[in-house]
Amino acid sequence: MKESKLLPFLRSQTQGELLARLFLNPDREFTLSALARAIGSSIPGVHHEVERLYNAGYINERREGRNRLVRARMDSVIVEPLTTLLALSYGPIPVIEAALTGAKGITQVFIFGSWAKRYSGETGGVPNDIDLGVIGSASTDELEDLLEDAKKILGREIDIKKFTTSSWNEGSSMIDEIKSSPHYFLKIK
């Protein structure tokens, strides 16, 4: 089991990422397979963590055909402090994905810098600002507007670096450095 580097008192990275998906998206229901895809884990691993959370009373579930849909229970006294911890430690991926889903003019989005290093398993302190690369035609002003609430939720600045598709493909010293360092592509729909 891969240990958590972002919030080390959690049992595993899977547990932290699962909690972040659920509690930072409280209005959404997830199937176990969607959760597994989103966090890059196996369905049995997600099933195990979901069972623990359900049995402890932290999530709700319902069935829709063969699908088991789960969502965070927001009526517990632990929700506010847990959500704050998750936003500060695991938050950038699910919060930014939610903020940019459906946005026009975005081809790809990725996190790089110290947050990407933590996601790739490098140890170190909790990162400060979030380095976000955006490939596409959306303007920086549009992106800033879309990410305003995400900044508040995360309690961090988001430093946006914009690239056109052609500039990303052609490369530059900065792009080459990003490509050769840890970077994490987000799943934007």
Question: Model-found features: residue ranges?
Answer:
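Active-site glycine-centered loops adjacent to acidic/histidine catalytic or metal-binding residues
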Residues: 113
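Catalytic core of pol beta-like nucleotidyltransferases
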Residues: 2-51, 55-108, 116-127, 135-189
